[in-house]
Each structure stands twice: as C-alpha cells, then as structure tokens.
Amino acid sequence: MKQKLLIIGTVWPEPKSSAAGSRMLQLISLFKAQEWDITFATATQDSPNRYPIEDLGVHAQAILLNDDSFDVFVKELQPEIVLFDRFMMEEQFGWRVATACPDALRILDTEDLHCLRKARHLAVKEKRVFKLEDLNSDTAKREIASIFRSDLTLMISTYEMSLLKNYFQVPETIIYYLPFLVKPSSEKELSKRPTFEERAHFCTIGSFRHEPNWDSVRYLKESIWPMLREELPKAEMHVYGSYPPQKAMQLHNEKERFFIKGWAKDAQQVLQSARVCLAPLRFGAGLKGKFIDAMTVGTPCVTTPIGAEGMHDNLPWAGIVAKEEKELVLAAKQLYSDKTLWSSAQENAAAILKSFSEELYVAEFLKQVKELQHNLHRHRNQNFMGSMLLHHSMRSTEYMSRWIEAKNK
C-alpha cells in the first residue's frame, strides 16, 4: 500500500514566480519518485499562475483556516507524513495534525529563516549594521518554537544550519540540510550556451513580492546603475520578476537604459542572454534561486555577501562578491568587460552546481525519513523541549483558533 504525504502549502506552487515554488516542486517530485500518494492542501485562493500539480498525479485540496473541517479531512486521509511549507503553516495546522494523526511524521520546510531575513531588513531600514542580537525577535520565538515542535526541519543553507545549532541551540537531530537539488546539464545543453561575445547587458530576476528582491531593484536604480551606466555606456539593465507593482513599473527608463521587463516565462532563457547577473541584495536569507539559474546557463553573478551566503562555502564564487556601492560597480564593470575573468567565473559555477547535485542528497534524505518513521516515539522522547512547546501550542493556539471559529459562525 502506498504511503501518504500531505503537504500544507502557504500558497499554490508557482515555480515560474519564485524560488520557493521551484523548491516545493522539487520536494513533490522527490516523494513522487518513491511512488508516494501526495495531497497538496492550501487555504489560499487558486492562482492562474500555479503549477498544474494534478498532472504529476498530486491531489489538490482547498482547506480553511480556523475550521474543524480540516480535522475531518486530515483524520480521513491519515497521512504517514505531513510537510508544512514554512513555520506559519505549522503554527496554524500543526496542533490539529498532532491531535488527529499523532503517529504522522511532521516535517517543516523553512525555505529560509524568516527571523534572519526580517532582522537584516530592520537593520537596513535603520541604516545600521546587523547584529546577532537582532535575532531575538517575536518572529524568531515563533519560528524556533515551530522548529522544536516539528520532528524534522529542512534547511537549505549551511549558514542557517550553523545559526540554528550555535546561536539558537537547536539539536542537530531535528534539523536536516537539504538544499536546492540540481540536475546536471547535458553536453548538448552546455554546447548551446551563448559565448561571451554573443551575450550583452545586465540582468536580474526575482519576485517583486519578495521584499529583498524589491529592495535590490530600488538599490540598483538609485545607487548602483547611475554609476555603472557611466562606466559602460552601451550596457543596459534588464529587470525581470513576477508580480511587478505599478511603483516598480515606474522605474522603467529607456533614456537611462534601465528596463523593467516584468514577468519572464523562462528565467533561465532571459539569464542566458545576459552577460552578467547583477543582484545587490542588502538583506535576505536562504539560497537564491536566481543564482542557481544563472550558474546553470553559465551567466556569472555579481552580488553581496548576503546574496552568496550558504551557496558556495569554501568554493570560489561564480563571479564577484562585493559589499559597498563602489565595489559593486567596479565588480560589475570588470566581470562585464574581462573575458578571462568571466570564463573563470563560469568554471567556478560548474563546481558550485556540482555541490548541489541531487544524487548527493536524495537517497540520504529518504533514508533519514524512514529511520525517523521507524523510531518516531524514541525520537520525540529525546526532544522534550519540542513536546513541551507542542503541549502549550495545542492549548493556546487551539483556544484562539476555536474562538475565531466560533466568532465566524
């Protein structure tokens, strides 16, 4: 009999809109390859841009927040594993799953550490340097509590794994490193890449709904591009991204060679035509899908330490990492103009992509899941903090949810 996996999503997967959507599709494909029976449930409205998961044999299920109908649904389904897409979903539905399906393995996929991203954002807003103490926020208390309550939490960044272990004192036994999974390019795909001479202009891409992306576009427009366009009078800046608001479209300026292109049907295609991917991210967390895509098509990247964080560890970066405005401008100019440097960055990208090869991670991850399923009782007994937080969550969250439910009737 097939094992059942229930995924509770924040939104419907949109791999062409965000890296989070691509990540979710990777997880679905991973479990589908094991012939699991998968149900994807979310409380958000259907989207015309969502991936047709039904074509993969995945059941799509609409659910409601703060409603007993979910309890009935999950009790009837009786999944062996429930995967929560970000900590907010675990907060909303974790206690209901624990009550209706106490033997189900509960896995949290963080995507990125929200508390880290928000703390860095606050430091940028306040025009100061980020400090580790900034992490002691209400968001961190919620997110770390969610990690403790879950049987296993998936992390995509080595930096964030280290932060959880060393700063938040999260036991190694309840967190697991599973980054973006990359399939190697074929010789045919590699041979089709445009050469240095065949490429032109700078490009960046990312959902405008993701605050670090929107901030980096404004930063490009106001601080980086005015200097860079003076250095490279023929180069253009092409900005792609899903859900561009009107205020983003207003940044479009042909005279300044700054083009807001909006939605890209194929991220890799637009990145492949550019000579350099330029994304000066001032805050953020997790891994950046734009750089994986850029590396895959051989487009070197200029970014900040935050942009490259967790992506290359001890390997040389696939381009140049710079922090200050003038350094970023110089880096972009050098990489755009120097063919030898550009070719070297391409070679570095190949090594980085190899470190994300799916064959390095999938089998070990599935082995870990099976071991946890077989030893779930012992695993939970060793995580007293998690069981204590779940106990209090089931009380406080449940009563709040019941109150909202009663109020809505």
Predicted regions mapped to residue ranges:
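Conserved catalytic-core segment of nucleotide-activated headgroup transferases in glycan assembly
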Residues: N166-V170, I175-S273
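Conserved acidic donor-binding segment of nucleotide-sugar-dependent glycosyltransferases
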Residues: A318-K326, Q334-K339
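C-terminal amphipathic helix plus adjacent low-complexity
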Residues: S343, N348-K409
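Acceptor-binding helix/loop patch of EC 2.4 sugar-transfer enzymes
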Residues: E14, D103-S137, E197, S207
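A short, active-site helix/loop in glycosyltransferases that binds the activated sugar's phosphate group
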Residues: Q92-F93, A140-E172, A248
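Short hydrophobic beta-strand element within catalytic cores of glycosyltransferases
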Residues: K290-D293, P300-T304
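Acidic donor-binding loop of glycosyltransferase active sites
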Residues: P79-E80, Q272-G286, T299
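N-terminal subdomain of nucleotide-sugar transferases
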Residues: M1-R50
